[in-house]
């Protein structure tokens, strides 16, 4: 296993379902990206706790925060923009390797394991940044939801890919 930089990670918009995607569309115009894998804490304290509060894990977050280049006319940019303004869902995969031959950027070959967060997401932030000395970008937040066809929840999974 080798360490990877953010440059070696991949963001895909999927068609089909999470279980059986029919198309993987690689989105190369991503800058920084963070996958928030945290949980709420549920207070389970009682008088039996005596001195310390007791907590159990609650719901996972699963938000993905990213910056994308402002590229009207790009099919994935347009899909993200439309999902925000129309309150529609996108199927996405935020993974550590290519999901199909032809998407390799860093010398990946043979059969590889690819891991990451897969799921259905609403776009809940589409803030346009207009810095004087930087490229025009949008701050995006993908917020997890149930997949409309199967009611599947987002999942962190590993798949085997032959390139």
Regions picked out by a protein language model, each given a short descriptive name:
Residues 1-2, 6-7, 150-163:
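Compositionally biased, intrinsically disordered low-complexity segments enriched in polar/Pro/Gly
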Residues 56-107:
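Structured, beta-strand-rich domain cores
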Residues 71-75, 148-153:
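Short, cysteine-centered beta-strand-loop-beta hairpins and adjacent loop/turn segments enriched
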Residues 81-86, 137-141, 155-163:
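Short intrinsically disordered coil segments
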Residues 98-152:
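Short beta-strand and beta-hairpin "edge-sheet" elements
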């Amino acid at each position: 296993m080798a360490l990877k930089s953010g440059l070696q990670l991949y963001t895909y918009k999927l068609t089909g379902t999470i279980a059986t995607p029919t198309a993987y569309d690689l989105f190369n115009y991503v800058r920084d990206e963070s996958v928030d894998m945290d949980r709420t804490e549920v207070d389970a304290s009682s008088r039996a706790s005596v001195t310390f509060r007791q907590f159990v894990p609650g719901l996972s977050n699963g938000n993905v925060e990213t910056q994308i280049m402002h590229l009207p006319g790009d099919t994935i940019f347009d899909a993200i923009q439309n999902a925000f303004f129309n309150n529609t869902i996108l199927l996405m995969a935020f993974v550590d390797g290519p999901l199909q031959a032809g998407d390799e950027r860093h010398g990946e070959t043979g059969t590889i394991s690819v891991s990451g967060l897969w799921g259905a997401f609403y776009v809940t932030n589409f803030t346009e940044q207009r810095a004087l000395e930087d490229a025009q970008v949008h701050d995006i937040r993908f917020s997890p939801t149930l997949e409309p066809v199967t009611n599947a929840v987002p999942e962190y999974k590993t798949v085997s890919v032959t390139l």
